[in-house]
């Protein structure tokens, strides 16, 4: 008797819907990559922005450096209520309160003020919760976006560095 060779013929695997979607997504990603390659290599269009000469436009919702606002009379809006310090998830805000004396009464609308107000940008995650928590609208994240430095002390913002001269947005409005 002779031996019989048995050959198994495998049926073709049918792709499920998620496998089809996966291949579609891969194809779409490759198409986007090809478009960018054609723009950069063949058409010689610039991909990057030359930073110091050209600055990009930021969205109106962009969260930049922290700024502190003054009211219309030029007084500090911050009344040292500690709301921003308590709500900060990164614990990046430090406030030291002091009583307002008669000599500086014209600078502060309430009976206490922030003697020391510091934000550690090395810890800050720019979540904007301090801006939302402030009942007086004293702190906003609408400053410049460039904050590179070679000195760690420059990344600790003091009240004097954050304070703007006069005005600022009305509570709840962005510039």
Curated annotation (Swiss-Prot):
One Pfam family in the UniProt entry: Fer4
| Disulfide bond residue pairs | none
- Where is this protein localized, as stated in its record? Cell inner membrane
The record's cofactor note says: Binds 2 [4Fe-4S] clusters per subunit.
Question: What Gene Ontology cellular-component terms does the record carry?
Answer: plasma membrane
Q: Which family does it belong to?
A: Belongs to the complex I 23 kDa subunit family.
Names of the cofactor(s): [4Fe-4S] cluster
Give residues annotated as binding [4Fe-4S] cluster 2. 88, 124, 127, 130
Which organism does this sequence originate in? Leptospira interrogans serogroup Icterohaemorrhagiae serovar Lai (strain 56601)
**Superkingdom classification of source:** Bacteria
Q: What is its main location?
A: membrane
Q: What is the role of the protein in this entry?
A: NDH-1 shuttles electrons from NADH, via FMN and iron-sulfur (Fe-S) centers, to quinones in the respiratory chain. The immediate electron acceptor for the enzyme in this species is believed to be ubiquinone. Couples the redox reaction to proton translocation (for every two electrons transferred, four hydrogen ions are translocated across the cytoplasmic membrane), and thus conserves the redox energy in a proton gradient.
Protein name as it appears in the record: NADH-quinone oxidoreductase subunit I
> What sequence ranges are listed for the domain 4Fe-4S ferredoxin-type?
69-98, 115-144
Subunit arrangement? NDH-1 is composed of 14 different subunits. Subunits NuoA, H, J, K, L, M, N constitute the membrane sector of the complex.
Name the PROSITE patterns on file.
4FE4S_FER_1, 4FE4S_FER_2
Query: Could you tell me what reaction this enzyme catalyses?
Result: a quinone + NADH + 5 H(+)(in) = a quinol + NAD(+) + 4 H(+)(out)
Topology of this chain in the membrane = Peripheral membrane protein
Q: InterPro entries, per this entry?
A: 4Fe4S_Fe-S-bd, 4Fe4S_Fe_S_CS, NADH_quinone_OxRdtase_chainI
Please tell me where [4Fe-4S] cluster 1 binds in this chain.
Answer: 78, 81, 84, 134
Could you give a GO molecular-function term held by this entry? Answer: 4 iron, 4 sulfur cluster binding
